[in-house]
């Protein structure tokens, strides 16, 4: 019997099954098609077989870590949400996917990873609370830098004095994109009628993050909430396909050890690497900042038997 397909993705929060755009899109597509996946919702990307999220381990043991390639593999396995689409609808899917990436993705990155208030009070807060120590000290900042580099690739190089004008232009285009999506959806349940397609999985992942997150700076969020059919569309998909998921982020300290072992066979190795990386980072910071200094000391006496016993007990704990 073939091993089950396994999906590793970011865990849920804000009332969503995942707080990550790509993870949410893949999860939603899998629900639409009924693909039999063993889902591991985690908050440590090092526990993924690829080191990134989302990632799919196929029945043959191959690891796929690009969302579009994951969906392509599910289609090859006969889980195809676009099977009944016409050629015209297939072309519309490609056009709207391109529109999402060009007009909505840059503003979504800016909203969650560049806007200072949103990043500090919402994005970094969630990841810092969700991630295990010591990853929560440095990984959110690294992720922010990666998203800022991605935004630069999407928008191109700009001088600092042009940034304010560029931001206005990006948000205006994103508002127009949302309005166009609202007009295209109309009163339908999904973009191509009564059954969801791959386009719905991606549109939902973009809109649901904007709708559900409690953003202190929500310029685009306010526009979305004025488009009532898009809001109802998100609520409908959440209630129909994710009725019991996404309420709270799991706390690393409260996760049962057996559950972690069940989810990821590399847990012990990654824990050791995480601790070593964190200790090295903290030691380096302490030395560079002068908190700790290295001085010569006279030879110390050998510790008593009692002291050795206490040290061993501390290590075992």
Curated annotation (Swiss-Prot):
The keyword Mitochondrion applies. One of its GO terms (cellular component) is cytoplasm. It comes from the Eukaryota. GO terms for biological process: mitochondrion organization; protein transport. The chain crosses the membrane at residues 164-184. Ubiquitinated by PRKN during mitophagy, leading to its degradation and enhancement of mitophagy. Deubiquitinated by USP30. There is a cross-link at residues 38, 41, 78 (Glycyl lysine isopeptide (Lys-Gly) (interchain with G-Cter in ubiquitin)). Pfam families: GST_C_6, Tom37. It is found in: Mitochondrion outer membrane. Keywords: Isopeptide bond, Membrane, Mitochondrion, Mitochondrion outer membrane, Protein transport, Transmembrane, Transmembrane helix, Transport, Ubl conjugation. Belongs to the metaxin family. Involved in transport of proteins into the mitochondrion. Essential for embryonic development. Interacts with MTX2/metaxin-2. Associates with the mitochondrial contact site and cristae organizing system (MICOS) complex, composed of at least MICOS10/MIC10, CHCHD3/MIC19, CHCHD6/MIC25, APOOL/MIC27, IMMT/MIC60, APOO/MIC23/MIC26 and QIL1/MIC13. This complex was also known under the names MINOS or MitOS complex. The MICOS complex associates with mitochondrial outer membrane proteins SAMM50, MTX1 and MTX2 (together described as components of the mitochondrial outer membrane sorting assembly machinery (SAM) complex) and DNAJC11, mitochondrial inner membrane protein TMEM11 and with HSPA9. This is Metaxin-1. It comes from Sus scrofa.
